[in-house]
């Protein structure tokens, strides 16, 4: 009995530690975020682009918020942990001020990220016959326009803006993952996705440059996650050719090679921007390597359930992914303890996985250069 009680106490302590906020270690007074569903805290839900989306109801948000918030996870995202580490409130979605009657104070930051967003503009995909697959047209350029509209309410004069943005952190991404996901899930070839990489990188460089011209001094630009470990894409490319899977983690190597290509090009682009803007601190965040820690050694990081199988989904197969029965829809099921899973709904990760990635970033271990 005593052993059982000790186990219960230890387990309860572990769960409580996992749910604790990050200890404030960063010194930013405001955060401005641009991206897609990896960092959207409610804009897609507020946009009304899709009627009654599944992310607008439980089990989304069940772990930390106990309600759906528009985040594509069971709880907090990387941006939430960065806000906690900065001693800031969770960054409000920009559309909250436009779609509700709430009075929103953006002085401490604003989140412009939208789930489903792409780096490239809507017409870029339309010209390639992919417009019907897009969830939203709130691209990176549109998010930049939102920031420009908000800026006059944050500071008025050039000296005032310089003072204000000197203490601000800008996150540009992760963005670009959907530029590849849309064609891949639409059964386009790997070559088609590979050919998009230069266009994606150029757009990220353009928007990062524009933000610096607007006054941004410290910017984090994350790379792509190991998409070959994504449950939805693993199901899409379910292949019996064992040699295409990484023996260390069973992730699909061609997809991860695409992510590596994106990240390599991104790092080169950022190196060029550092030369162009030597006064700005431009930081690459290595989401890929940070995530590969738990994909390679799941049990070491507490993922005793699964890292490749989705916690929430409607599939009967290996990855619990069924396009016609998404997480939160009738017929879907949710695992008992999301903290033991890395994949949340097939596309997005769990709060536990995001916390590990955020910890690596905040410590400086997976940023180049460090920013703490």
Curated annotation (Swiss-Prot):
Enzyme class: hydrolase
Compartmental location: Secreted
PANTHER family found in the cross-reference section: GDSL LIPASE_ACYLHYDROLASE, PUTATIVE (AFU_ORTHOLOGUE AFUA_2G00510)-RELATED, ZINC FINGER FYVE DOMAIN CONTAINING PROTEIN
Protein name per UniProt: GDSL esterase/lipase At5g45910
Top-level taxonomic group: Eukaryota
Active-site positions on this chain: 37 (nucleophile), 345, 348
Keywords: Glycoprotein, Hydrolase, Lipid degradation, Lipid metabolism, Secreted, Signal
């Amino acid at each position: 009995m005593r052993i059982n009680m000790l186990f219960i106490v230890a387990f309860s302590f572990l769960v409580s530690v996992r749910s604790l906020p990050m200890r404030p270690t960063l010194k930013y007074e405001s955060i401005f975020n641009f991206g897609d569903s990896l960092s959207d805290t409610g804009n897609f839900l507020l946009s009304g682009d899709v009627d009654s989306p599944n992310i607008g109801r439980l089990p989304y948000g069940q772990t930390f918020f106990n309600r759906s918030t528009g985040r594509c996870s069971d709880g907090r995202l990387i941006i939430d942990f960065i806000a906690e580490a900065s001693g800031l409130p969770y960054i409000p979605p920009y559309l909250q001020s436009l779609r509700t009657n709430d009075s929103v104070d953006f002085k401490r930051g604003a989140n412009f990220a939208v789930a489903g967003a792409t780096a490239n503009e809507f017409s870029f995909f339309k010209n390639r016959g992919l417009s019907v697959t897009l969830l939203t047209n709130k691209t990176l350029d549109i998010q930049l326009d939102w920031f420009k509209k908000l800026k006059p309410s944050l500071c008025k004069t050039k000296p005032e803006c310089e003072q204000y943005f000197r203490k601000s952190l800008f996150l540009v991404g992760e963005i670009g993952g959907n530029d590849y996901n849309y064609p891949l899930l639409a059964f386009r070839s790997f070559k088609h996705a590979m050919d998009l990489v230069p266009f994606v990188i150029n757009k990220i460089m353009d928007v990062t440059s524009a933000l610096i011209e607007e006054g941004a001094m410290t910017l984090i630009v994350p790379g792509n996650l190991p998409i070959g470990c994504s449950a939805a894409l693993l199901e899409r490319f379910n292949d019996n050719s064992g040699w295409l899977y990484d023996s260390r983690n069973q992730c699909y190597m061609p997809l991860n090679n695409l992510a590596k290509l994106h990240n390599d090009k991104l790092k080169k682009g950022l190196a060029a921007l550092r030369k162009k803007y030597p006064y700005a601190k431009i930081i690459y965040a290595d989401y890929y390597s940070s995530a590969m820690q738990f994909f390679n050694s799941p049990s070491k990081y507490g993922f005793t359930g699964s890292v490749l199988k989705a916690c929430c989904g409607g599939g009967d197969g290996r990855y619990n992914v069924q396009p016609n029965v998404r997480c939160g829809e009738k017929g879907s099921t949710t695992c008992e303890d999301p903290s033991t899973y890395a994949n949340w709904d097939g596309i997005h990760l769990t709060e536990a996985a995001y916390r590990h990635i955020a910890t690596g970033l905040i410590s400086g271990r997976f940023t180049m250069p460090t920013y703490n």
